């Protein structure tokens, strides 16, 4: 298999990104798909595009996708409480999401104190080397959800992870999600106002988590997600 990654920006500001793992015969289709995504994104025009292809040499770990749970009455406060994330930590996470700094990866916070535990500053932790092998989905919205579930599954597949909060930085996409090993993948509608680039990915963990091992798992271990 091959890993293919796309990153696009304008004046060093992130515009669009995507990645997957695929067989050789599918590379051309993904290259075209990611090229078109980069040059036709709602976040604006780009002046830089990076497409990177690497052969996957390490053993691939199989993960079962988090179940999708739809409940229009879900609130972030309730979900955080059910997963052991303090209200203070949740609010600290929302501060990162709503500030004007563009983080290119996830931020790891203590689920108890809200203290930032990673030391990657603006870069953040990048979840890479992943692909959704089988997905019961159709349509444009489901394609977006498929990619989000793949990321959420990887992020929540490690001991010590309590939950993850994600808000898209796309201008007109206002649906975020809250995911956890305990509650599955929960979409949160109208999580932000339209027309803003505010967004981000916050991972809430126990302070005793093996942080270096976790970051290595997210960034370097090949991961294939399947439906149960």
Swiss-Prot record:
This protein's record includes keyword Lipid metabolism: no
InterPro entries: BioW
Pathway: Metabolic intermediate metabolism; pimeloyl-CoA biosynthesis; pimeloyl-CoA from pimelate: step 1/1
Reactions catalysed according to its record: heptanedioate + ATP + CoA = 6-carboxyhexanoyl-CoA + AMP + diphosphate
Molecular function GO labels: 6-carboxyhexanoate-CoA ligase activity; ATP binding; magnesium ion binding
Magnesium among keywords: yes
UniProt keyword terms in alphabetical order: ATP-binding, Biotin biosynthesis, Ligase, Magnesium, Nucleotide-binding
EC class (word): ligase
Coiled-coil residue windows: none
Known cofactor(s): Mg(2+)
GO biological process, one term: biotin biosynthetic process
EC number: 6.2.1.14
The protein's assembly and partners: Homodimer.
Family designation: Belongs to the BioW family.
Function noted in UniProt: Catalyzes the transformation of pimelate into pimeloyl-CoA with concomitant hydrolysis of ATP to AMP.
Protein name (database record): 6-carboxyhexanoate--CoA ligase
Lineage, opening ranks: Bacteria, Bacillati, Bacillota, Bacilli, Bacillales
């Amino acid at each position: 298999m091959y890993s293919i990654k796309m990153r696009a920006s304008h004046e060093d500001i992130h515009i669009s990104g995507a990645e997957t793992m695929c067989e050789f015969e599918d590379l051309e289709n993904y290259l075209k798909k990611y090229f078109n995504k980069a040059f036709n994104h709602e976040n604006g025009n780009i002046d830089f595009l990076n497409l990177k292809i690497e052969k996957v040499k390490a053993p691939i770990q199989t993960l079962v996708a988090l179940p999708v749970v739809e409940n229009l009455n879900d609130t972030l406060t309730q979900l955080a409480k059910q997963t052991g994330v303090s209200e203070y930590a949740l609010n600290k996470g929302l501060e990162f999401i709503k500030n004007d700094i563009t983080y290119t990866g996830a931020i790891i916070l203590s689920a108890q104190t809200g203290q930032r535990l990673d030391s990657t500053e603006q870069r953040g932790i990048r979840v890479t080397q992943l692909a959704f092998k089988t997905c019961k989905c159709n349509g444009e919205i489901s394609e977006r959800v498929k990619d989000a579930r793949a990321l959420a599954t990887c992020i929540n597949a490690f001991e010590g992870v309590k939950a993850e909060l994600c808000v898209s930085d796309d201008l007109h996409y206002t649906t975020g999600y809250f995911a956890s090993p305990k509650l599955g993948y929960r979409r949160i509608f109208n999580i932000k106002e339209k027309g803003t680039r505010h967004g981000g990915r916050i991972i809430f963990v126990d302070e005793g988590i093996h942080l270096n091992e976790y970051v290595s798992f997210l960034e370097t271990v090949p991961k294939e997600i399947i439906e149960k």
